[in-house]
């Protein structure tokens, strides 16, 4: 995948791990499902996040009227924390802690990419992670679910090292990237 179609960096480069872009969108696409008249939040599910992200979105002010229990501050904080946690899990080569926030397809894709890194004897480092802002862009309904879409602006340092030699495979240990998802 071409991560340029999902994220933008100030230096014109792309994040070496295109799945992070997709992952952020999946984490952002928290779905609200009506179950027995009660609303319950869950991640991604079977919702097509790309279709939701490209649709004309309704303003968040309408959503807060629909779901009075919705807390925008709580969601933006959760998204920031999940972004950092996801980067940390990837670097530790153990993505199981973020499994509840991933669709089956996304988790499988991430796991396959992680296995390839392990087979090559490489570790991808994402350091000096900062979520600069989380902006809830709006919401839409898809398949009976409410899908919320957000834009995250982040700063990272992204590079890959060879596990055996410690030599730099790709990226830059010092160059900051400013990303928008």
List where the protein language model places each region.
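Exposed beta-sheet edge and beta->alpha loop/turn motif
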Residues: 27-36, 141-181
């Amino acid at each position: 995948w071409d991560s340029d179609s999902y994220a933008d960096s100030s230096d014109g480069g792309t994040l070496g791990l295109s799945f992070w872009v997709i992952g952020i969108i999946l984490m952002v696409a928290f779905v609200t499902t009506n179950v027995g008249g009660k609303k319950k939040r869950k991640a991604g599910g079977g919702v097509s996040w790309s279709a939701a992200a490209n649709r004309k979105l309704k303003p968040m002010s309408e959503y807060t009227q629909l779901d009075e229990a919705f807390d925008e501050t709580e969601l933006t904080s959760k998204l920031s924390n999940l972004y950092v946690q996801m980067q940390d899990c990837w670097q530790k080569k153990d993505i199981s802690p973020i499994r509840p926030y991933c669709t089956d397809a996304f988790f499988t894709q991430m796991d396959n990419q992680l296995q390839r890194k392990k087979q090559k004897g490489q570790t991808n480092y994402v350091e000096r992670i900062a979520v600069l802002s989380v902006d809830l862009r709006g919401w839409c309904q898809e398949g009976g679910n409410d899908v919320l879409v957000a834009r995250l602006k982040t700063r990272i340092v992204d590079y890959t090292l060879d596990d055996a030699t410690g030599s730099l495979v790709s990226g830059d240990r010092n160059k900051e990237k400013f990303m928008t998802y």
